[in-house]
Amino acid sequence: MNLILTLLIIFAIIGLLILIFGIWLIKKLLFPKKKPKPYQVRHGSSSSKRGYGSHDVYHHHYVTKDVYVHDYGDDDIYDERGKKEGDKDDSLIDKAIAFGAGAVTGYGVAEYGEEIKEEVEDIVKEGEDIIDDIVEEAEDFVEDVVDDFDNGGDDDY
């Protein structure tokens, strides 16, 4: 009976997870997030204010989840560094630089890792010795103060 009850609970939990995933998937498909509408700022030149003509420029600024978009009128999307979305050359260069830096670091760790480890161990050992010396001096000072207090001494510390 316990086995049947355990299996029933397990299948109920699995069914509940499938139901939650299905509802989430339907929500994503039927109600996708919409891009925010840009607000328009109308700029007029000083000549249009005087009545000599019209020079109207529309800029669209809006912020999406992770990209600030400035619509220059050429239907291209620019990222926060002012590069077009379709440009691949710079991203490939960035990836190559990151890969090269990782390779150099990996080579350095493989080549000099043992020496670095020994130097770090020496530094840690020196630090432990310094801490031990400080603790010993503090204990000696406390013992001197307690002994002096017990003996009725009047030394200034």
From Swiss-Prot:
Cellular component, GO annotation: plasma membrane
Keyword Transmembrane: yes
Subcellular location: Cell membrane
Main location: membrane
Transmembrane segments: 3-23, 96-116
Superkingdom of origin: Archaea
Keywords: Cell membrane, Membrane, Transmembrane, Transmembrane helix
Topological category with respect to the lipid bilayer: Multi-pass membrane protein
Name of the protein in its database record: Uncharacterized protein MJ1280
Lineage of source species: Archaea, Methanobacteriati, Methanobacteriota, Methanomada group, Methanococci
